[in-house]
C-alpha cells in the first residue's frame, strides 16, 4: 500500500503479500510456515479481513501470499469494495519478486517487479528501478524498521519513508488487552502505526484514511 492519506494508496500500502510455497535450494534446511489473519475495522466497524501466509526458510527463499477483501456499507448498502492479492518472493530480507492485483472499487491495477543482480526493477504499471535491497511494506519483518524506502504494491512506486519508535501501550485484541510496542511509518501521506507483541510478533496496525477516518488491523 502507499502511505495513507487517500484511501486507495493507504489500503495499497497496507496490503502486500503472497500464497505459494517456495521450495528451498537446500534440501536439508527446515521449512517453516507462518500465518496471520487480521480483522479490519473502519471507525470501529468491521469491514473485512486481511490474511497473510509466509512459507519457506529465511536462509534460502520465502514466499508470502497476501489476500484482502473489504466492503464498506451504509444502511446495508455496499458503498465501497476492495480486493487485493499479492505474491512476494524474498531472499533474506530483500524482495526478489512481486506480483500484485488490486480491484479498488472497480478500478483494477496490476504491479510486477523483479530483482536482477544489484538492481530492482518495477515493470508495471510504470517502469521504475532502484539499486540495492528493496523491501515492501512487510510489517511482519523486523528489518522493516531500518528502511528508508519501501515498495508500494498497489502503485508500484518506491516510496521514501522514515520509521520511528512509538513506545509501549495496551492494545485491545478481542476481549483481551495486550502490551504492545509501536513503530510509526512516515511517508508522503498520513503515517501508519504498526504494533508488535512483547515477543516481537506483528499484532496490529492503525492508519487514517479519507475524512480522518481510522482504519485498524487487529490480529485474530
Residue ranges: model-predicted function:
Residues 1, 6-11:
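N-terminal export leaders
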Residues 17-23:
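N-terminal signal peptide c-region/cleavage motif recognized by signal peptidases
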Residues 24-117, 122-126, 132-220:
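Acidic, serine/threonine-rich low-complexity disordered tracts
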Amino acid at each position: 500500500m502507499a502511505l495513507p492519506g487517500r484511501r486507495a494508496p493507504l489500503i495499497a500500502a497496507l496490503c502486500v503479500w503472497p500464497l505459494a510455497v517456495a521450495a528451498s535450494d537446500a534440501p536439508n534446511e527446515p521449512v517453516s510456515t507462518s500465518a496471520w489473519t487480521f480483522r479490519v475495522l473502519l471507525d470501529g466497524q468491521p469491514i473485512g479481513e486481511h490474511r497473510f501466509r509466509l512459507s519457506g526458510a529465511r536462509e534460502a527463499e520465502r514466499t508470502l501470499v497476501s489476500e484482502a477483501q473489504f466492503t464498506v456499507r451504509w444502511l446495508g448498502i455496499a458503498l465501497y469494495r476492495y480486493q487485493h492479492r499479492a505474491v512476494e518472493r524474498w531472499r533474506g530480507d530483500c524482495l526478489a519478486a512481486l506480483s500484485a492485483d488490486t480491484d479498488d472499487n472497480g478500478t483494477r491495477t496490476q504491479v510486477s517487479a523483479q530483482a536482477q543482480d544489484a538492481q530492482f526493477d518495477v515493470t508495471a504499471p510504470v517502469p521504475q528501478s532502484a539499486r540495492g535491497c528493496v523491501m515492501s511494506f512487510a510489517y511482519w519483518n523486523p528489518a522493516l524498521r531500518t528502511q528508508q524506502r519501501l515498495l508500494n504494491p498497489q502503485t508500484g512506486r518506491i516510496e521514501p519513508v522514515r520509521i520511528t519508535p512509538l513506545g509501549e501501550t495496551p492494545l485491545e485484541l478481542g476481549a483481551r488487552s495486550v502490551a504492545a510496542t509501536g513503530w510509526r511509518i512516515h511517508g508522503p501521506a498520513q503515517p501508519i502505526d504498526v504494533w508488535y507483541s512483547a515477543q516481537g510478533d506483528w499484532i496490529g496496525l492503525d492508519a487514517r484514511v479519507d475524512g480522518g477516518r481510522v482504519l485498524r488491523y487487529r490480529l485474530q
